[in-house]
Amino acid sequence: MNRINILNADTANKIAAGEVVERPSSVVKELVENSLDAGAKNITIEIQNGGESLIKIIDDGSGVHPEDVEKAFNPHATSKIKDTYDIFSINTLGFRGEALPSIASIARVDFKSKTEDFDMGKELIISGGEKESLTDCSMNRGTQIEVRDLFFNVPARKKFLKTTARESALINDLVNRISLANPDVSFKLFNNNKKILNTYGNGKLIDVIRTIYGKSTAENLIYFEEHKDTASVYGFIGNDTLARASRNNQSLFVNKRYVKNRSLTVAVENAFRSFNVTGKFPFFVLFIDTYPELIDVNIHPTKSEIKFKDERFIFKVVFDAVHSAMREYVKDTFTLPEEEEKKFEALKEEVIQESLDKEISTLEKLKENINYKVSEDKKKEEIYSYNPSKDYEAKTEVNIPVDFLSKENQDESFSINNSLENNEFKEVSAKREISYDPILIKNELKDKVSESTSESLERSDYKCNKNEYGNSIEEIIYREAKFPKLRVIGQFNKTYILAEYDSTLYLIDQHAAHEKILFEKYSSDIAKKKVEIQPLMIPLVVTLPTEDYLYYDENKEIFEKAGFKISDFGDNSIRIEEVPYFLDKLNPTELITSMINNLKKMGTGETVEVKYNKIASMSCRAAVKANDVLSILEMENLIEDLRYINDPFHCPHGRPTIIKFTSYELDKKFKRIT
């Protein structure tokens, strides 16, 4: 039977450190929060090797009393609270008294501090929780703490650290968030002696946002605020141009504490999606100020999660604030003056009348274009006394030649048999019988469709001629066709290609099919180092947020081998000179940003091949889109290319590209068989 042991101080501190100090960014968080609690207005953070070698914090706060310097490193020693009652009304960021002893137990610490009332400060040096010296020192008011060799005595913890670039990015992201919460404090961040961040501390939140995220972000923000008796909500939300595929650019602060709360994040996103259907996540910086008694921050070791006394109420306040601001923003964009609304109504009536006149004119032309035979003069007389309005009332269907089909009616089928029976027509020339079959009418539609097709294909870069691809499609893993050669019937809703083979109907999603073709070709080109590149006419300079730049810098070789020629341009800026050939018509800035976001979500443990595949998946942006009109030849070539790729049945995102219905299945749906 194991007996109960009392752990020694060193072991207990290391256990506590495991909860409080997960990685270098945890150290930065605890120390910067101490500086803010001390009333500092200027805080400098220096790190080396992702914070593993050195973390140095300098502030101009109130400092620590000389007699309290050594006491501050004792477990549960704090100046923030005195008894249990204070726990339920916390006004400071820190309060447990765990940070300093936890950090000192797993690192080498040099702590200096001086208050306004003393001429000299105190310097305390601790290594692995053991005091080495306590001496007087000369310094200005404030505190300076150096943390070196983090986890030097807990080597097992080092295995869980990510790369230096990743740890640096986490620290940068943390300091960015803290800067947003404290616009009246000037923050400086140095990484390996290079200045990464410098905020002005002028109290203007928009200036901090501009410094961190750039000018374009600051210019596309919508301010919101809502005030209730027990809570105030305010902040900025980005318009749809700032929406991204991840939540990386979302910041939530409660009483200036950066926290994560799924419910409140959903409140903002729901309000945003009421006016935008982008399917992406909005940019926002949200502040909630409430009474300390109404929240509990003592539910998580890192205080990154909090509990509200009435979370439903806070949810509603947040939703209403954002929803109201978005509604006004959209309203300002689309509202018409009263005079213009009246003009619009008048114009609408005019268009309706004009449309009716055209329909009547079309019916008149119908009599001249349909070849028919009549055996009795009486029937001929009935035809020439034809009353269009009467037939409208009778809802008689009339077969109209393609030449006279209006754009609105091109998707309808016109059958003349039943309609002409009602008018007692005896014969109709088979040559003039009309059915809306794209194969039969493609020559008539050719001129009308070609202009729209050319425009859409120029945008998508899809080539009709297979030779434009060279032999690349044939080189992708297998030449064996994966499904039979199909006969194209037409295009439905400008999105789906209809084709048939052996009494089976095939529906192909043109966008999903084309993006999979591009994906496999691009992946193959990357693997063979044969990516065709397209120089930009004018090289584009892009300034990235610091975190994004660090990810780019870590994956430079990946971008280069993927067909991008990018050079550094100073101060987190890059110069895009060349891109893969089929991406040259896309926005390079959005493309690079999306690729970096994809790499962010992957982490650093993925292989180079996985990263290449993630970048290759961006080829979908160059694929033909829904609502792109394709000619029969273009659809045939698209399907033919799809037949010979490795996996033609799913797009890079896992959605199906092609589905089929047998004649038997269709007969069952129409109850022709049981």
Swiss-Prot record:
Pfam families: DNA_mis_repair, HATPase_c_3, MutL_C. One of its GO terms (cellular component) is mismatch repair complex. CDD domains: HATPase_MutL-MLH-PMS-like, MutL_Trans. The keyword Transmembrane helix does not apply. Keywords: DNA damage, DNA repair. It comes from the Bacteria. NCBIfam families: mutl. This protein is involved in the repair of mismatches in DNA. It is required for dam-dependent methyl-directed DNA mismatch repair. May act as a 'molecular matchmaker', a protein that promotes the formation of a stable complex between two or more DNA-binding proteins in an ATP-dependent manner without itself being part of a final effector complex. Belongs to the DNA mismatch repair MutL/HexB family. HAMAP family: DNA_mis_repair. This is DNA mismatch repair protein MutL.
